[in-house]
Regions:
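Catalytic loop of short-chain dehydrogenase/reductase
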Residues: 75-100, 106, 110-113
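A short, exposed helix-loop element centered on a Lys and neighboring polar residues
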Residues: 61-62, 106
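Active-site loop of short-chain dehydrogenase/reductase
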Residues: 22-23, 37, 68-81, 114-117
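The beta1-alpha1 cofactor-binding region of Rossmann-like NAD(H)/NADP(H)-dependent oxidoreductases
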Residues: 1-12, 43
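Substrate-binding pocket helix/loop in short-chain dehydrogenase/reductase
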Residues: 37-38, 45-50
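Conserved NAD(P)H cofactor-binding loop of Rossmann-fold oxidoreductase domains
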Residues: 29-35
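C-terminal helical subdomain
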Residues: 114-130, 134-171
Length: 171
């Protein structure tokens, strides 16, 4: 699904409703990275990349919350990056999208936590090892199964200790 298409996101959730019912957990993971100096940027590509992390995330959050609120429970998690909290040279577009994503998650946490919807943001700070990578030296890359376990752990947190943000890094 192209998360920048509101219609495609709505259709995805309608199809999931038919097959799975109301979700307990929704994870927004899409990202678009565009590197380059500010004067070299293709603004059409920049706009699309920013929309993935902002409009896409907002659209997915709206559809997820609309389904979870009547039940009074659920978790909506967003995958950020180091660029969610600090900018890097030649990565301004990525930073705009990830800062926006983090701001959305922070706002939704304040809005939806009182309604028993757990909102979480994950700062994934490092390279991710492919699932079949047997050459991953200790502390060099994040292991994808362990990232998944971190998401599941946050989802299972007791409401009295809900985290809204967790940083994941291999060292």
């Amino acid at each position: 699904c192209d998360v920048t298409s509101i219609q495609q996101v709505e259709n995805l959730f309608k199809k999931a409703d038919e097959i799975l019912g109301t979700p307990d957990l929704v994870i927004f993971n899409p990202s678009a990275r565009l590197r380059g100096t500010v004067e070299e940027l293709d603004m059409r590509a920049a706009k699309k990349a920013i929309e993935v992390s902002t409009i896409g995330a907002l659209s997915v959050a709206k559809e997820a919350a609309t389904r979870m609120l009547p039940r009074g429970s659920g978790s909506i998690f967003f995958t950020g990056a180091s660029a969610s909290v600090k900018g890097f040279a030649n990565s301004s577009v990525f930073a705009v999208g990830k800062f926006g994503l983090r701001g959305l998650a922070q706002s939704l946490a304040r809005e939806l936590h009182p309604k028993n919807i757990h909102i979480g943001h994950f700062v994934v700070d490092g390279q991710i090892s492919p699932p079949l990578d047997t050459n991953n030296e200790l502390d060099s890359k994040l292991i994808s199964d362990e990232i998944a376990n971190a998401y599941l752990h946050m989802h299972r947190q007791h409401r009295s200790v809900w985290s809204w943000e967790i940083e994941l890094r291999p060292w």
